[in-house]
Design a protein with these regions (language model features):
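N-terminal helical cap/lid subdomain that shapes the substrate entry/recognition surface
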Residues: 2-100, 116
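Conserved phosphate-coupling serine/threonine residues in phosphotransfer and NTP-handling enzymes
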Residues: 15, 108-110
C-alpha cells in the first residue's frame, strides 16, 4: 500500500456512476444504419473511455461525425434519468472521505454539462471540489495524455505523489501513470480487472470501501461486505 493520500481523482462513467447501459444504448441507436448488421455492445465496450468523437470515428469509419455525435447526445439525454445510477457504496465512501478531509476531483472525457448533470442526478456533486472537475471541454489533450490529471492536481495545489487516480478504463491508468499519480482500477469495469492491470494499474479494488485504506482510514469500514 502507498503512503496515505488526501486527494483522490475519479473518472466518472463506469467508475463511480453506472452509465454503462446508457452509453451502449446511445451508441446503438445513434449508429443504426451506419454500422454493419451485427454491431453490438461487444464492439463498443473496448473503446469506452475514449472521447466520443474518437469512438464515433472508429465505429463508423467516417472522419466527419458531428451528426452522429448529435444523435448520440439526443438519445443519451432522453434516457439519462432512466438508466443512470451510482455504483455500490460510492455515496457512502465519498461522504466519509470528505468528512475526513480527503479532497475529491473528477477527470473525465465527458462534456462539462453532462458531467455535472450526472453528478447532481446521483447525489455526488456536493462531495466534489468544483474547481477540480476536469472535462473534455477543459483540455487540449484528453486521456490517456497526462494533461487532464495534471490539471486537476494543479487546481487542488497537490503534487502527483500525494494523490491517486481511480478509473475503469485503460486510458485512466495510462493518464494517471503518465502524470506520476498512483493508478487504481475498479474491478467492476466492463473491460475486466486483468485488462486494467495490463494497462498499468498499480492497484485494482473490488469494492469502493477499499479506498479508505489509501487515505489511512480504518479498514473496519469494510465490515458487512
Amino acid at each position: 500500500m502507498i503512503k496515505p493520500v488526501r486527494t483522490m481523482l475519479f473518472d466518472l462513467d463506469g467508475t463511480i456512476v453506472d452509465t454503462n447501459e446508457l452509453i451502449i444504448r446511445s451508441f446503438l441507436e445513434a449508429l443504426k444504419g451506419v454500422v454493419p448488421e451485427g454491431f453490438s455492445r461487444e464492439h463498443i465496450i473496448p473503446s469506452m473511455g475514449l472521447t466520443l468523437s474518437d469512438q464515433m470515428k472508429i465505429f463508423s469509419g467516417l472522419e466527419q461525425v458531428d451528426h452522429l455525435i448529435a444523435a448520440y447526445r439526443e438519445v443519451n439525454y432522453r434516457l439519462h434519468n432512466e438508466l443512470v445510477k451510482p455504483f455500490a457504496y460510492v455515496g457512502e465512501v465519498m461522504d466519509h472521505l470528505q468528512k475526513q478531509g480527503v479532497r475529491i476531483g473528477i477527470v473525465t472525457t465527458k462534456m462539462r454539462l453532462s458531467t455535472e448533470k450526472s453528478l447532481k442526478f446521483v447525489g455526488l456533486y456536493d462531495y466534489i471540489v468544483p474547481d477540480a472537475i476536469v472535462t473534455i471541454d477543459d483540455v487540449k489533450n484528453a486521456k490517456p495524455h497526462p494533461e487532464p490529471v495534471l490539471m486537476a492536481l494543479d487546481k487542488l495545489g497537490v503534487e502527483p505523489a500525494d494523490a491517486i487516480m481511480v478509473g475503469d478504463s485503460p486510458v485512466d491508468m495510462q493518464s494517471a501513470n503518465a502524470a506520476g499519480v498512483v493508478s487504481v482500477g475498479v474491478a467492476w469495469s466492463l473491460k475486466g480487472a486483468e485488462k486494467l492491470r495490463e494497462s498499468g494499474a498499480k492497484h485494482v479494488i473490488d469494492d469502493m470501501r477499499e479506498l479508505y485504506a489509501f487515505a489511512g482510514l480504518e479498514r473496519e469500514k469494510l465490515a458487512g461486505r
